[in-house]
């Protein structure tokens, strides 16, 4: 009798638990569809946060979540969508478009591998699916903050003092649609600025007729696009645009694109772009963007050249820190061209205020870098050059993994008393062009300038990747892979590694570890390569300079 009672009790209890979980699941799914809508928090009475983070991009999110996991009381303020530039208008949508362009290349050339492929492309469908994925990431970011017990405030922040900020534009859940926007004042022992950056528009006549790289992702139809700028964002976008069937022009102010990258690598890229009918206009000093009619723009250069009939003109001439509304001047926070100046601990000129990510620049310490390694070649020459440098030198690395690393390590230092800092040297970089570029360390030109030509040895190779070997086209039209090692001193310390070609974006990551561990050419020579791969060429290179 009692056994039956216990059985019924446990049965109904189990049924209740399962039912509750199912209901919660449906509630979550229902709520999840609206997670992109704002969720507002009312400040808790007398709350003093251990850390207030201004900005919900990669660096801000990383710092906030890590600090919360260290049991700190954390608030995060964001005026737009969570995820920052990277998730919303940068790395993520860009890589999806890069993937689409790569799929195009494979489909277009599949006949060389025996496939009879006919295809069409639906840009609006790709945009829809891409944006759904980004919205999903926005929602995941919001869930992660909730899971880590980070209080999220949505609005625009500005400083009232070194410990207090004003948030404009927040609403609580009981006043979401009616009444004036609330203002909230938060107090924190430490404040982190991670506001990222925004596109720059120069004072050019007709600039209002253009869009930025951010708005590029809103384009669903176009026949002809011009991009003004020659940095990595411009180069990545123009390569995508052409492969999506759009007539493409890129306008470079100087004699070549990507001037800060190794010249030999960029020469290979420019040749590939020209073979794919991407128009590279050099020495292009734009003086006017004229609107002839709707979706009919012309680009006018200072030397009289005119390029016509563009549906869209995209300006990619740089980005600037999004700091002007923070009221930094009230606290005398040191800035340099609007970038917040921080030390190697990410601390600003105000003791309890920090900055990470694209909005800041890190002042290098004064000690001689790599002094033990410099003895491999000509230390005296290098020291003399250093003595002639009187101005401050800064790191300004605008990359998502750098911001994430800096944010997490800052939280560790603040709340676990750890000492590790972000290492801004030898940061691997990839340009998602077609073909992609991977690079670590110094270019050949920079190495010669620092160490002297007599102390630099170059190893390089150019070849046709096996993937393209079966293409039924002229050999000179087949895509090439080019790679280079920049070595310094008698022990041939590798100070730079560069590659352009198929899968370069994946190849370069592992070599970054080797360079960080001070690998030499001998280390590469003594490593057994994997065959047949493009990466094996790094381990079998022969010098052109004896």
UniProtKB/Swiss-Prot annotation:
Q: What does this protein do?
A: Catalyzes the reduction of glutathione disulfide (GSSG) to reduced glutathione (GSH). Constitutes the major mechanism to maintain a high GSH:GSSG ratio in the cytosol.
Miscellaneous notes: The active site is a redox-active disulfide bond.
**Active-site residue list:** 531
Q: List the disulfide bonds.
A: 86-91
Q: Its GO CC terms?
A: apicoplast; cytoplasm
Pfam families for the chain = Pyr_redox_2, Pyr_redox_dim
Q: Where does FAD bind?
A: 58-59, 78, 85-86, 94, 157, 358, 400, 531
Entry protein name: Glutathione reductase
Does the UniProt entry include the keyword Transcription?
no
Tell me its EC number(s), please: 1.8.1.7
Q: Where does glutathione bind?
A: 58, 65, 141, 408
